């Protein structure tokens, strides 16, 4: 008698990662595993400590390790950009990749930081759009912010950085309406700014205290309607935001950017577009040891 039993192929459980060094501080596993549980999905999201010397080999072995994609954090974002087989327009403009996924055998990359920045402000301050933005810092994080602001149609984006040459390089890359303003004359732009953004690490836990105390922003010259935001989220309320609050200005912390930027990758790997909720924020705040929220 012929055996007609058909063996069903066991469905693979999607596995994703966050890779960087150091990686122990990353909140990404908490975020993605919260969503996996919330939506009752089978899947894994794992932190991977990988050095710069090991990173290329790690990427070439993703499928063998059972990964369908993942997040890339410091110091690997630019290397991921160079190694991905395909980069979308967002990643190309920002010059870094923080989200990877497969399309067939092709390793694809994007950068979700610009989306995370805009979505955070959409969520926390829906009327945040204006004409003039003042951005402090010209590092990797600033590139995503400039991209987001340009996409949202700001008519003037003033970039301020201690090393003016770095700011000039970014302004040339992004073109109009990005322009460079002198670090010590930033106060002259403040009274015009509808949005003020800090993309530097000044005020971050473990940052240089001398540098922190020398960083200033004369908020008493700012529009009363201006919105102030900091992409740093440890501490949740940075000295930059504290000073803005002291002058009665509206502020948005940087935690929401982290939460919202995670949405795009989760949807790629696990097939559902998750929502950033108060419950998720509370979970991450608890993990951070923060009581605010």
From Swiss-Prot:
Shikimate binds at residues 26-28, 73, 98, 113, 233. Pathway: Metabolic intermediate biosynthesis; chorismate biosynthesis; chorismate from D-erythrose 4-phosphate and phosphoenolpyruvate: step 4/7. It is an enzyme of class 1 (oxidoreductase). Belongs to the shikimate dehydrogenase family. This is Shikimate dehydrogenase (NADP(+)). One of its GO terms (molecular function) is NADP binding. NADP(+) binds at residues 89, 137-141, 161-166, 231, 254. One of its GO terms (cellular component) is cytosol. Keywords: Amino-acid biosynthesis, Aromatic amino acid biosynthesis, NADP, Oxidoreductase. SUPFAM superfamilies: Aminoacid dehydrogenase-like, N-terminal domain, NAD(P)-binding Rossmann-fold domains. One of its GO terms (biological process) is aromatic amino acid family biosynthetic process. It comes from Bartonella henselae (strain ATCC 49882 / DSM 28221 / CCUG 30454 / Houston 1). Involved in the biosynthesis of the chorismate, which leads to the biosynthesis of aromatic amino acids. Catalyzes the reversible NADPH linked reduction of 3-dehydroshikimate (DHSA) to yield shikimate (SA). Its EC number is 1.1.1.25. It catalyses: shikimate + NADP(+) = 3-dehydroshikimate + NADPH + H(+). The active site is at 77 (proton acceptor). InterPro entries: Aminoacid_DH-like_N_sf, NAD(P)-bd_dom_sf, SDH_C, Shikimate_DH, Shikimate_DH-bd_N, Shikimate_DH_fam, Shikm_DH/Glu-tRNA_Rdtase. Homodimer. The gene is aroE.
């Amino acid at each position: 008698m012929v055996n007609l039993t058909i063996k069903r192929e066991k469905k693979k459980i999607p596995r994703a990662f966050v890779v960087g060094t150091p990686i122990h501080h990353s909140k990404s596993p908490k975020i993605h595993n919260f969503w996996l549980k919330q939506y009752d999905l089978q899947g894994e999201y794992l932190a991977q400590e990988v050095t710069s010397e090991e990173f290329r080999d790690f990427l070439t072995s993703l499928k063998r390790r059972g990964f369908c994609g993942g997040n890339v954090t410091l110091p690997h974002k630019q290397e991921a950009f160079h190694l991905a087989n395909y980069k979308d327009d967002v990643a190309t403009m920002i010059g870094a990749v923080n989200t990877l996924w497969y399309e067939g055998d092709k390793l694809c990359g994007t950068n979700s930081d610009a989306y995370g920045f805009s979505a955070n402000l959409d969520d926390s301050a829906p009327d945040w759009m204006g004409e003039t933005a003042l951005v402090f810092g010209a590092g990797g994080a600033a590139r995503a912010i400039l991209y987001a602001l340009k996409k949202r149609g700001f008519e003037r984006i003033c970039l301020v950085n201690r090393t003016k040459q770095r700011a000039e390089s970014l302004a040339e890359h992004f073109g109009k309406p990005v322009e460079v303003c002198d670090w010590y004359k930033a106060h002259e732009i403040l009274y015009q700014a509808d949005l003020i953004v800090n993309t530097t690490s000044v005020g971050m836990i473990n940052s240089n205290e001398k540098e922190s105390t020398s960083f200033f922003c004369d908020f008493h010259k700012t529009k009363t309607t201006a919105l102030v935001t900091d992409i740093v989220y440890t501490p949740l309320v940075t000295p930059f935001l504290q000073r803005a609050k002291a002058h009665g200005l509206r502020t948005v912390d940087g935690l929401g950017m982290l939460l919202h930027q995670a949405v795009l990758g989760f949807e790629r790997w696990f097939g559902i577009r998750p929502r950033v909720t108060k419950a998720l924020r509370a979970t991450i705040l608890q993990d951070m040891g923060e009581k605010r929220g």
